[in-house]
Amino acid sequence: MKKKQQSSAKFAVILTVVVVVLLAAIVIINNKTEQGNDAVSGQPSIKGQPVLGKDDAPVTVVEFGDYKCPSCKVFNSDIFPKIQKDFIDKGDVKFSFVNVMFHGKGSRLAALASEEVWKEDPDSFWDFHEKLFEKQPDTEQEWVTPGLLGDLAKSTTKIKPETLKENLDKETFASQVEKDSDLNQKMNIQATPTIYVNDKVIKNFADYDEIKETIEKELKGK
């Protein structure tokens, strides 16, 4: 009887340790992907990256984002349209998106697909980009699949679904994705979304007032 009690107590201790470790891992992942970070200052290079706006716009806004990141979805649905209306459409800002892959295989698949769209049908990129974020569900699950990406390409681009799926399988555009990863490392990207206004890192991506004020200061300095 005593041995049985000891075994039960030992099992309870082990179970408690496992639960604590799992909870700690979840906290670390959440902090990495959706909270503040220590990104370095300095203007990120947008050579070869998707760009929306006039080439000679005096201010550059760059989003380091992940298509599977819930906070990135919020930024693109709530904040980005304001930037577009107030600054991009007026020729004051050009906007660029750099892939970050913090959420595993699905993040990489989405990044590969987005790179293909940018290279093969750039005029359709931002529609594809917006619709892909809209596909993100409210609950964590493996939703990014070759089938979904193929269907999205069919409805938003000139790329044939079978062509996109084949390129995903072959990782045809892996070199572009690796360039994004290299830039992430160079800028020490630790969270998504990370937003740059020229060489300034925005502290709170969801605070449009901060973003607007920073853009306006940069415009005055030009």
Curated annotation (Swiss-Prot):
Residues 37-220 form the Thioredoxin domain. Residues 1-36 form the signal peptide. Disruption phenotype: Cells partially restore cytochrome c oxidase activity in a CcdA-deficient mutant, possibly because the bacteria can no longer oxidize the 2 heme-binding thiol groups in apocytochrome c. GO terms for molecular function: oxidoreductase activity. GO terms for biological process: establishment of competence for transformation. It is found in: Cell membrane; Membrane raft. Keywords: Cell membrane, Competence, Disulfide bond, Membrane, Oxidoreductase, Redox-active center, Signal. GO terms for cellular component: membrane raft; plasma membrane. SUPFAM superfamilies: Thioredoxin-like. Disulfide bonds join C69-C72. Required for the stabilization, possibly via formation of a disulfide bond, of the obligatory competence protein ComGC. May be required for the stability of secreted proteins with disulfide bonds. Not required for sporulation. Belongs to the thioredoxin family. DsbA subfamily. This is Disulfide bond formation protein D. It comes from Bacillus subtilis (strain 168). The lineage of its organism: Bacteria, Bacillati, Bacillota, Bacilli, Bacillales. The gene is bdbD.
